[in-house]
Amino acid sequence: MKILVDENMPFVEPLFGDLGEIIPVNGRTLTVAQVRDADVLLVRSVTKVNAELLSDNHQLKFVGSATIGTDHVDLAYLGERNIPFSNAPGCNATAVGEFAFIAMLELAQRFDSPLKGKVVGIVGAGNTGTATAKCLQAYGIKVLLNDPIKEKQGDPRSFVSLETIMAQADIISLHVPITRTGEHKTKHLLDEARLTALKPNTWLVNCCRGDVIDNKALVRVKRQRDDLRLVLDVWEGEPTPMPELVPLAEFATPHIAGYSLEGKARGTFMLYQKLCQLLNIAADKSLLDLLPSFNIKAVELATAPDEKALLQLARFVYDLRDDDNMFRNIFLNENGFDTMRKNHRHRREFSALALAYDRQLEVDWLSNLGFSGVGQ
């Protein structure tokens, strides 16, 4: 069995090596000829899977995407051809939630404006939005949720309108899929009018899709409103972001919010489980066996951390400033965006870091944030 796999997908060999011949490929430049004789195709969001790509393949047994979203896959076409498909919903939700939370802590430190006491509006209450809310609520932050689709579906959580979030939230964090048509279209959800209407000193964090914000309008508005603070992990026109927008962001990264080692391992592992199910064979590999031990064994706390100390703990796991600095130095280079994504060092999640502190009740919130070993 020939398994064609994106070269940037981790842990493929230990998971799929027993199932067939693994052929790594560049997902962004994948051709019809390369796919022609594949039995299994494993992709990421950079690969458009459609009739054009699969036109010469008549033996494909499974398409898997190690991603939350599916907008890069023509699901109707796969359905017509009876080709099984699976993605990995929620695989990197924890990573995105922690990234957004860390970014807010970094902004708080940089501008001497504590995160504690602010109101955060989360637009999109799916896997990543929920993970972001979990971090914030663990830290005691008031969260407003906006998700008209989930609200209509009867989700029991309390929701507010986007206009309410714009009026009341100090921070807005975006976590919606890209939808280009319909009642709940998200393309340019934040257009020039809404960007202009943001309350003074709003922090805007985008970890979902670049097209959710009108990037040209964002440049115009930001140039007139220096009070707005931007954290941008996604961009219109990826992998070529607007060169004039990057310098206007307080933190800028190349679509890597979900790039934790745990998240990427989960994505590949979920596809492994699905393929084993389709082939009717036992999935006998373990996710835990894939992950290396963290380079810091444990951190002993003398007191419950304040916000400054919490940021330091977060930086032990992931220092956003490093990726921000690297991206600014590389994004104008040819293939700089993709090169940084490909060579990303796969940060760890909070769960990789064990904390030791005697007074459990004072630090339960650290356990809720995701740190391990607290109070043990």
UniProtKB/Swiss-Prot annotation:
Q: Which UniProt keywords apply?
A: Cytoplasm, NAD, Oxidoreductase, Pyridoxine biosynthesis
Q: Which family does it belong to?
A: Belongs to the D-isomer specific 2-hydroxyacid dehydrogenase family. PdxB subfamily.
Q: Does the keyword Cytoplasm apply?
A: yes
Please identify the protein, giving its name as recorded.
Erythronate-4-phosphate dehydrogenase
Task: Name the positions where NAD(+) binds.
Answer: D147, D233, G258
Binding residue positions for substrate: S45, T67, Y259
Question: What CDD domains would the database entry show?
Answer: ErythrP_dh (cd12158)
Provide a Gene Ontology MF annotation, just one.
4-phosphoerythronate dehydrogenase activity
Q: What gene is this protein translated from?
A: pdxB
The enzyme class is oxidoreductase
Q: Name one Pfam family in it.
A: DUF3410
Q: How does it assemble?
A: Homodimer.
Q: What is its main location?
A: cytoplasm
